Amino acid sequence: MKTLLLTLVVVTIVCLDFGGGLICYMGPKTPRTCPPGQNLCYTKTWCDGFCGSRGKVVVLGCAATCPTVKPGVDITCCATDKCNPFPKTKAPWERP
């Protein structure tokens, strides 16, 4: 029984330490492994001067903590692999 428990503990430690890190999108089709200590993926969107013609600016990445929310900026954070895909949006001229 002790051997089984010890084996489970060792396997758990190995899986946690060498899991390879969280995978987040950094661009529309660019997943990357986050650096150690950065255990969240985020999606940040906002309108700039070209929002009417190009749509919102989108920034994707990894973070240790969810970025601070600022007025006019939408931020979502998540903690599973590839949980921050590039938002599917229509071009402004395709909107009803």
From Swiss-Prot:
It is found in: Secreted. Transmembrane segments: none annotated. Pfam families: Toxin_cobra-type. GO terms for molecular function: acetylcholine receptor inhibitor activity; ion channel regulator activity; toxin activity. InterPro entries: Snake_3FTx, Snake_toxin-like_sf, Snake_toxin_con_site, Toxin_cobra-type. GO terms for cellular component: extracellular region. Residues 1-21 form the signal peptide. Gene3D superfamilies: CD59. Disulfide bonds join 24-41, 34-62, 47-51, 66-77, 78-83. Keywords: Acetylcholine receptor inhibiting toxin, Disulfide bond, Ion channel impairing toxin, Neurotoxin, Postsynaptic neurotoxin, Secreted, Signal, Toxin. Expressed by the venom gland. Belongs to the three-finger toxin family. Long-chain subfamily. Type II alpha-neurotoxin sub-subfamily. Potent long-chain postsynaptic neurotoxin. Pseudo-irreversibly inhibits the nicotinic acetylcholine receptor through competitive antagonism. This is Alpha-elapitoxin-Al2b. It comes from Austrelaps labialis (Pygmy copperhead).
